[in-house]
């Protein structure tokens, strides 16, 4: 079994906890003195860095939320001075301000280290040629995977997203053996392959590193069957680092967390209490070694379970199960974060519509689709088809500019969308993700 960094990935649990404790002490001291936001929060809770003596003391520390990052836009949570920041990324969220994350040179070297661990676990070697088909740019996927492939010593082809037929010809002609992309793009690649009259044997892909959106085992089987490769899950988020926070090994029963850099906890999202291993709750991460924008106990809003049983692959790190949902109402559609509240705010700007709407998310031919059903106000409802189509197009255009993905708008008659008592339900997610 190939392991990139056995010293860290196979460390005994006692040694790992001791290392995490040391790193946490150093981190708390660092943010206390460099980030006023954390110093104020800790002072309000009457905690000083001296109170943190081991990793168990993490429960004394404050949580960080997405809203905290937004409120401190752009650089309010940055701990390193601007002269130390060598790169900036931003989250793929579309509401309000994006989350701006600065990286120091050391952060980038940690990132390419954890990515090399992931790729090695998938079976990538120096002899592979690897296509990175995540978006390059502010999104962390492209460059995150790119430098991991380079660090490992394989050949990287920075394909990015875009011309899929050209991409397939490159895979065939350059004998590309691995690909990093979203699972939905992998299926789109398979469809394009069929359209071009080529078979999986013509391209010879061996390994797929798939992430940036939740996907099911059925989807994995289909991708593997149609592209002739073995697909592995990779998890990450820009607020913590980007791809490379956790990864599957050959056993594929959960994803190993790079917990010498990212300390995981599971909490009850209602009471905020830490939960034991084996219990489902909200995933929380602390960046133990980050310099640019470290975070304490960041609430990911992803629901999953942590496991600490030893793995047959020899790695000793804690594993996370599949993401089973969200503790907020965020939807991930084609890799983009979408909140029902965004749709609502667009509808509220248009007097033709009642603020009664329903989002129907589906997966057709393995691509996510979003339909927005909205009620037309009685005084705007008419038999004039041209007028109704113009209203429909106006809403679709507005939604596209706000959400960054296109939605199919369906105009509904007044009072046709069911009203609910209490918490109104605005989402029907027909994708069988669980």
PLM features: residue spans?
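Conserved S/T- and glycine-rich ATP-binding loop of Class I adenylate-forming
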Residues: 31, 91-94, 130, 179, ...
């Amino acid at each position: 079994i190939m392991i990139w960094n056995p010293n860290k990935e196979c460390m005994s649990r006692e040694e790992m906890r001791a290392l995490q404790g040391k790193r946490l002490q150093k981190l708390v001291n660092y943010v206390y003195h460099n980030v006023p936001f954390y110093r104020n929060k800790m002072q309000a809770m009457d905690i000083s860095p001296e109170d943190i003596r081991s990793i168990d003391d993490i429960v004394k520390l404050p949580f960080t939320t997405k809203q905290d990052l937004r409120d401190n836009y752009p650089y309010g949570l940055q701990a390193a001075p601007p002269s130390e920041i060598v790169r900036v990324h931003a989250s793929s969220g579309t509401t309000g301000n994006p989350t701006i994350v600065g990286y120091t040179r050391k952060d980038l070297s940690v990132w390419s280290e954890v990515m090399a661990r992931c790729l090695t676990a998938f079976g990538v070697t120096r002899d592979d040629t690897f296509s990175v088909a995540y978006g390059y740019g502010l999104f962390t996927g492209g460059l995150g995977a790119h430098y991991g492939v380079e660090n490992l010593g394989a050949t990287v082809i920075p394909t990015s997203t875009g011309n899929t037929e050209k991409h397939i010809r490159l895979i065939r002609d350059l004998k590309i053996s691995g690909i990093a992309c979203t699972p939905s793009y992998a299926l789109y690649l398979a469809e394009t392959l069929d359209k071009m009259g080529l078979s999986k044997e013509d391209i010879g892909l061996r390994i797929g590193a798939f992430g940036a959106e939740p996907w099911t085992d059925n989807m994995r089987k289909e991708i593997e069957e149609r592209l002739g490769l073995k697909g592995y899950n990779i998890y990450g988020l820009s607020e913590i680092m980007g791809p490379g926070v956790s990864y599957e090994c050959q056993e594929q029963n959960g994803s190993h967390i790079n917990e010498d850099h990212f300390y995981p906890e599971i909490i009850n999202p209602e009471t905020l209490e830490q939960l034991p291993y084996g219990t489902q709750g909200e995933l929380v991460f602390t960046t133990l070694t980050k310099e640019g924008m470290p975070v304490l106990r960041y609430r990911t809003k992803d629901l999953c379970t942590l496991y600490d049983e030893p793995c047959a692959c020899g790695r000793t790190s804690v594993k996370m199960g599949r993401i089973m949902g969200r503790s907020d109402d965020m939807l991930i559609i084609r890799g983009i974060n979408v909140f029902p509240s965004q749709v609502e705010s667009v509808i509220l700007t248009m007097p033709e519509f009642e603020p009664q709407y329903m989002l129907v998310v589906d997966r057709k031919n393995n691509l996510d689709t979003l339909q927005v059903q909205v009620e037309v106000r009685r005084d705007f409802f008419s038999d004039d088809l041209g007028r109704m189509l113009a209203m429909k197009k106006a809403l679709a255009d507005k939604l596209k500019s706000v959400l960054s993905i296109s939605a199919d708008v369906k105009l509904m008659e007044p009072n046709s969308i069911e009203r609910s008592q209490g918490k109104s339900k605005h989402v029907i997610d027909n994708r069988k993700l669980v």
